[in-house]
Structure formats: C-alpha cells, structure tokens
C-alpha cells in the first residue's frame, strides 16, 4: 500500500512538473499579452496589404485582357486610322477578320496549356503493371 502511494505521489509530481514547464501552464503577464496583440495587428495589416496587391494585380490583368482598353490595341487602332491601306468597301470585312484574329491570338496567349497524354487516369493492376484507363493509343 505504501509503495502504491509513493508511485502515485511521484506520478503527480511529474505531472505537475510537466504542466508548469509548458508555456500554456505559465501565468501570462500584461506585457506578454500586449506584445501578442500588437503582433496580431501587424499580421492582419500585412494580410490586408497582400490582399490589396492581389486585387490590384487581378484588376490589372482583367484590364489587359480587354482588347478595347489595352494600350497596344489602342496604338494599333490609331496607326490604322492614320494610314488607310484598304479601300473603304473592303474595310468592314477585314475589320471583322482582324478582330477575330486578335481575339484568337489573345486566347492563345492567355490560355493555360495543358499537357495531356490522352489518358484521363491510370490504374495499377499489380506491382509493375500499369493499365491506362481511357487512353487513346492511336493518338498517343
């Protein structure tokens, strides 16, 4: 009975040492809390700055994707107005083509290229043997 009591006291003493040694077990001073609060405020400010920068970048990218508002397309339009090379009757037909070509070029530039192998997945049957699901072997 006495040994059980000693083991119990030893276990409680170890537990007390572990709890008091942990940072959450210590009493916090007002200075520590103030420092944590200021750190949190600075973190929130930097997050706000990052969000604002991302919003500006997204806005800038959206403005550049619009062919009517981009500076390069305005410059091209001004050059086209200064030097008419095509007769006025053929111009409406070619304007549609240039707008179409310009939009296709912008789509090519803005599109994210995906490298596909023609397979939408692969399945492992056994170790070392892989069978492709949905693979087009003719297109490879």
Curated annotation (Swiss-Prot):
Q: Name one GO cellular component term.
A: extracellular space
Q: How is it modified after translation?
A: Cleaved upon secretion to produce the functional hormone.
Name the site position(s) for Cleavage. Answer: 113-114
Q: Where is the signal peptide?
A: 1-21
Q: Where is this region: Disordered?
A: 59-102
Molecular function in Gene Ontology: hormone activity; hormone receptor binding
Q: Which residues form a coiled coil?
A: none
Which positions are cleaved off as the propeptide during maturation? 22-113
Compartments, record wording: Secreted
What Pfam families has UniProt attached to this entry? ANP
Q: Which GO terms fall under biological process for this protein?
A: blood vessel diameter maintenance; cGMP biosynthetic process; cGMP-mediated signaling; negative regulation of systemic arterial blood pressure; neuropeptide signaling pathway; receptor guanylyl cyclase signaling pathway
Coarsely, its chief localization is: secreted
Which PROSITE patterns does this chain map to? Answer: NATRIURETIC_PEPTIDE
> Which keywords accompany this UniProt record?
Cleavage on pair of basic residues, Disulfide bond, Hormone, Secreted, Signal, Vasoactive
**Cysteine disulfide partners in this protein:** 119-135
Q: Where is the composition biased (Polar residues)?
A: 66-81
Briefly state the protein's biological role.
Hormone playing a key role in cardiovascular homeostasis through regulation of natriuresis, diuresis, and vasodilation. Has a cGMP-stimulating activity.
By sequence similarity, the record places it as follows: Belongs to the natriuretic peptide family.
The protein's name is Natriuretic peptides A
Q: Which organism is it from?
A: Oreochromis mossambicus
Tell me the gene name. Answer: nppa
